[in-house]
From Swiss-Prot:
Residues 23-203 form the UmuC domain. The gene is dinB. It comes from Caulobacter vibrioides (strain ATCC 19089 / CIP 103742 / CB 15) (Caulobacter crescentus). Mg(2+) binds at D27, D120. Poorly processive, error-prone DNA polymerase involved in untargeted mutagenesis. Copies undamaged DNA at stalled replication forks, which arise in vivo from mismatched or misaligned primer ends. These misaligned primers can be extended by PolIV. Exhibits no 3'-5' exonuclease (proofreading) activity. May be involved in translesional synthesis, in conjunction with the beta clamp from PolIII. Its main location: cytoplasm. It catalyses: DNA(n) + a 2'-deoxyribonucleoside 5'-triphosphate = DNA(n+1) + diphosphate. Binds 2 magnesium ions per subunit. The keyword Cytoplasm applies. It is an enzyme of class 2 (transferase). Signal peptide: none annotated. This is DNA polymerase IV.
């Protein structure tokens, strides 16, 4: 890429494939913090952290706070050590959902092929829309950026590429207010010197595993023997090899944005003891978490469902600071929700679920806090053992307690 031949702007570049690229990734810039700053101008030049409690984690840090080292999923006590002057605001997800709806309303006018990843990001397929809009995808997206900032008061960054993987990377190259493109011709050379954790799904454990066999850059993976990768990472190794060559066959699928994953069970006899209810709850959490891992998503909201003998349904929800795809976290939250219910009530059904998903594969393992990461590693290993030797191959202590 080179500077724009028309104006030579340092932030404007010319790209030979710009007129033909049609897969985009759009990401709001520090979304939650930006909404709060827009609504309270006195916060504009201050470091803002969205999160709750010293024992919680950072949900979002504004760019000023990030300059001090604060970042998403970091424990709050650590973030406040790095940025002691930060203004801490508890997340207001109802407000953020409304702003997300306004943004997606504008996206819907461009194309029906939109795959939301979370409240603040989405993949967009603009293939074949040139005649409809009288403009290339790049032109439409540039207009969309300006319109969102003008009408909603928030900024977004856009990545344009031939596939979802490259579009996601491109959107992160020039934040905030960024617009970057990665073409097919340059993809492999662009990726070659990047660290392996730029690839989706590569967290600290995979980085260490790859380093043990001398693979530290994306170029190393691209040049690696397929058998070596398969022996080390199984089918995941083959996937990383394709990505290292800039290849990604996934389509932008609006239907992939599943609304909820849940499991429930009805008792033969009504249960009222808290311990009995928890014993029934654990395998449901395992089932939900396993399904989330299989689909490559993590839920931001945990739900508990209860039905009383008179068939009244009680649903409780809690928004998590960090998305989860582990039974450990889902069970912990569902149990806390259950403990808030009046003791002594009888129930004929209990259920657990996750909703408001983010793409865990795209975000990578580093999106999770340390405890969540350890639980994820453990539960993924259990998945593999059960898949090979049967469901009874590994029985957890909680499951044994319920027997």
């Amino acid at each position: 890429m080179a500077r724009c031949p028309a104006c030579a702007s340092p932030r404007t570049v010319f790209h030979e494939e710009l007129g033909t690229l049609s897969i985009a990734h759009m990401d709001c810039d520090a979304f939650y913090a930006s909404v709060e700053k827009r609504d309270d101008p006195s916060l504009r030049d201050l470091p803002v952290i969205i999160g709750g409690g010293k024992r919680g984690v950072v949900t979002t840090a504004c760019y000023i706070a990030r300059m001090s080292g604060a970042k998403s999923a970091m424990p709050m006590f650590k973030a406040l050590k790095l940025c002691p002057d930060a203004v801490v605001i508890k997340p207001n997800f109802a407000k953020y959902k409304e702003e997300s709806r306004r943004i997606h309303e504008k996206l819907d006018r461009l194309t029906p092929l939109i795959q939301p990843l979370s409240l603040d990001e989405a993949w967009i397929d603009l293939t074949g829309t040139e005649r409809l809009h009288g403009a290339t995808p790049a032109q439409m997206l540039a207009r969309l950026q300006a319109e969102i900032e003008r009408d909603i008061g928030l900024t977004v960054s856009v990545g344009l590429a031939p596939n979802k993987f490259l579009a996601k990377i491109a959107s992160e190259l020039d934040k905030p207010r960024g617009f970057s493109a990665i073409g097919a011709a340059e993809a492999q050379s662009f990726l070659a010197n990047k660290p392996v954790n730029i690839l989706p799904g590569v967290g600290p454990a995979t980085v260490a595993s790859l380093a043990e066999i001398g693979l530290r850059t994306v170029g190393d993976i691209a040049a690696a023997d397929l058998k070596l990768l398969a022996n080390r990472l199984g089918s995941g190794g083959m996937r990383l090899h394709r990505l290292a060559h800039g290849q990604d066959s996934r389509i932008v699928d609006p239907d992939q944005a599943r609304k909820t994953i849940s499991a429930e069970t009805t008792f033969n006899d009504d249960l009222h003891k808290r311990e009995d209810l928890e014993d029934e709850l654990w395998p449901l959490c395992e089932k939900v978490a396993k399904q989330a891992r299989q689909e490559g998503v993590a839920g931001r909201v945990a739900t508990l469902k209860l039905r009383t003998p008179d068939f009244k349904i009680h649903t409780r929800r809690r928004t998590l600071a960090v998305p989860t795809q582990t039974a450990r976290t889902l069970f912990q939250v569902a149990r806390e929700l259950l403990s808030a219910e009046p003791r002594g009530l009888a129930y004929r059904l209990i259920g657990a679920g996750l909703t408001e998903f983010v793409d865990a594969d795209t975000a990578g393992a580093d999106m999770f806090a340390d405890e969540e990461r350890r639980a994820l590693k453990s539960e993924t290993a259990i998945d593999a053992l059960r898949g090979k030797f049967g469901a009874a191959a590994v029985v957890t202590g909680r499951a044994l307690k319920g027997r």
